[in-house]
């Protein structure tokens, strides 16, 4: 039965959004530590509010210089985002930075360093030695909506947010400020995106900017039209799109002065925009021994390769772990009726092609590197502006052979 007129919405935010400032700070601290000590154990949470940054968590590392320089790392990232003046409501050079970081719990460390398989079962494989850093469930997803195999609403929302930042930093629209949000509503027929219904852009701006005569036309021409021209989607009608710019009327007070921010509060923005399920774990500030992060990346890798191999047009995969255990305790594959082979067979070959033990994920995706700060805004998946290891299509042939 045909389903018409269904509207699905996803949102994105810019790097100047308060929650994203926190994600960026947490991941910048992580990268600084990994650059000096790839085996660093890091769990860093950040809070920002008017004039203040608080960085807390647990860290075990030999990167003494990077650890001692965390305050400067925080300031540099805030300034890079664009908060460099009290006129913008926040200044990385003069804000208060408070650090409260302790060591990783030894009870957690023992389960990660010596997994149950090694400690109790006597396993000799080195990859059985590293246990999951926590229990939990993680999802991965891929779909043929876009070349990057992401749901179109979140892919388009991210492109708009990135463009907002580009026109601000390049001086095309110099009156814009760092804080901003985008939202995209798309009409679907039988799971095919057919029409771009509504785009909402809320962007912080200088105080003297006219909404109707300056901001709205500039956003339409320099942001929306540019992104749509670049997107060039085959089935999407954009001729009647409604654009709403700053529906409150103005957006002068923004960033941490407008709202407090916290690490890990944009997990749907970070993943699939609500189109796929989420296990609940945030990414930023966590080293790859935390399966919240590394296993979610691995499952995106699995899903994307399944779709690229032609085994399904869209797929969602779930993995689950017990703390201190190396082997997953659960694996689930859902193809939504789009599989070209028996879905049971897909589920069977996934663990044959992909080693989902934490140590193997870290090895195969080369995750002990300072690559995380670039993921802190505009999504962790389907990125078209940076190369990320979990986006590689290096298992397609192996999957085809396996079926």
UniProtKB/Swiss-Prot annotation:
Residue numbers binding K(+): 45
Region described as Flexible loop: spans on this chain: 104-114
Keyword Nuclease: no
Protein family per UniProt: Belongs to the AdoMet synthase family.
BP-aspect Gene Ontology terms: one-carbon metabolic process; S-adenosylmethionine biosynthetic process
GO MF term set: ATP binding; magnesium ion binding; methionine adenosyltransferase activity
Details of cofactor binding: Binds 2 divalent ions per subunit.
SUPFAM superfamilies: S-adenosylmethionine synthetase
Main location: cytoplasm
Listed GO CC annotations: cytoplasm
Cell location: Cytoplasm
Protein source organism: Mycolicibacterium paratuberculosis (strain ATCC BAA-968 / K-10) (Mycobacterium paratuberculosis)
Record's keyword terms, sorted: ATP-binding, Cytoplasm, Magnesium, Metal-binding, Nucleotide-binding, One-carbon metabolism, Potassium, Transferase
Residue positions binding Mg(2+): 19
Cofactor(s) named in the record: Mg(2+); K(+)
EC number, as in UniProt: 2.5.1.6
Name this protein carries in UniProt: S-adenosylmethionine synthase
Pfam families: S-AdoMet_synt_C, S-AdoMet_synt_M, S-AdoMet_synt_N
Listed Gene3D superfamilies: 3.30.300.10
Highest taxon of source: Bacteria
Pathway given in the UniProt record: Amino-acid biosynthesis; S-adenosyl-L-methionine biosynthesis; S-adenosyl-L-methionine from L-methionine: step 1/1
């Amino acid at each position: 039965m045909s389903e018409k007129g269904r509207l699905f919405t996803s949102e994105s935010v810019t790097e100047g959004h308060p929650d994203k400032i926190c994600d960026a700070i947490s991941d910048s601290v992580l990268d600084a530590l990994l650059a000096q000590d790839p085996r660093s154990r890091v769990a860093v949470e950040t809070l920002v509010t008017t004039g203040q940054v608080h960085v807390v968590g647990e860290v075990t590392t030999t990167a003494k210089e990077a650890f001692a320089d965390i305050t400067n790392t925080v300031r540099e990232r805030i300034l890079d985002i664009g908060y460099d003046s009290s006129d913008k409501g926040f200044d990385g050079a003069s804000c208060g930075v408070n650090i409260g970081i302790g060591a990783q719990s030894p009870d957690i460390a023992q389960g990660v360093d010596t997994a149950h398989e090694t400690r109790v079962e006597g396993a000799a494989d080195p990859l059985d030695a590293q246990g999951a850093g926590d229990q939990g469930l993680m999802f991965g997803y891929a779909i043929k909506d876009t070349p990057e195999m992401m749901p179109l609403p979140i892919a388009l929302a991210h492109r708009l947010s990135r463009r907002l930042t580009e026109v601000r930093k390049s001086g095309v629209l110099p009156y814009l400020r760092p804080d901003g949000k985008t939202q995209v509503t798309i009409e679907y027929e039988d799971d095919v995106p057919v029409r771009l219904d509504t785009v909402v852009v809320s962007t912080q701006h200088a105080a003297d900017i006219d909404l109707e005569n300056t901001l709205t036309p500039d956003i339409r021409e320099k942001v929306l039209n540019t992104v749509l021209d670049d997107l060039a989607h085959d089935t999407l009608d954009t001729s009647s799109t409604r654009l709403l710019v700053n529906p409150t009327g103005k957006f002068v007070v923004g960033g941490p002065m407008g709202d407090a921010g916290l690490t890990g509060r944009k997990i749907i923005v970070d993943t699939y925009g609500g189109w796929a399920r989420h296990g609940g774990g945030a990414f930023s500030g966590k080293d790859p021994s935390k399966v919240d992060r590394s296993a979610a990346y691995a499952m995106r890798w699995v899903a994307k390769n399944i779709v690229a191999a032609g085994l399904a047009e869209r797929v969602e995969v779930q993995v689950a772990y017990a703390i201190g255990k190396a082997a997953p305790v659960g694996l689930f594959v859902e193809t939504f009726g789009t599989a070209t082979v028996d879905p049971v067979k897909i589920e069977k070959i996934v663990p044959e092609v992909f080693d989902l033990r934490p140590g193997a994920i870290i090895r195969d995706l080369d995750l002990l590197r300072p690559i995380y700060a670039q993921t802190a805004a505009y999504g962790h998946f389907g990125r078209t502006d940076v190369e990320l290891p979990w986006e590689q299509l290096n298992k397609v042939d192996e999957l085809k052979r396996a079926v």
